[in-house]
Swiss-Prot record:
This is UPF0751 protein Dhaf_1351. It comes from the Bacteria. Belongs to the UPF0751 family. InterPro entries: UCP020408. It holds the Pfam family DUF2325.
Length: 102
């Protein structure tokens, strides 16, 4: 499974990859959620190549959250919104625990 995580700090990427790898074969793609030039285009490129998108609500900008939601809809991808910023919240959502979906 290929997952895009939007939001969080760059140093969390390695930690997320290690811990999510324990849930099965998981490939992580990471976007820090800070709006940049060409934000929409970059997010769409990222999202079209994954199976699932997780937005960490407390760790990304509103602009990136909305851009992610629009890009996921355009690419027909599922989006989970995590209110928790910790890795345990993300692992629970991937494992099928209650999640906020769009």
């Amino acid at each position: 499974m290929r997952i895009a995580i939007v939001g969080g700090q760059n140093h969390n990427q390695e930690t997320y990859g290690k811990l999510l790898g324990k849930t099965g074969r998981v490939e992580i793609h990471f976007y820090d959620g800070i709006p940049k030039k060409h934000n929409k285009r970059n997010l769409e490129k990222l999202i079209k190549d994954v199976d699932l998108v997780i937005v960490i609500l407390g760790a990304c900008s509103h602009a990136s959250m909305w851009d992610t939601k629009k890009a996921a809809k355009k690419c027909h991808k599922e989006v989970l919104f995590s209110r928790g910023i910790g890795i345990s919240s993300i692992v629970k959502q991937i494992a099928g625990k209650p999640a906020y979906t769009a």
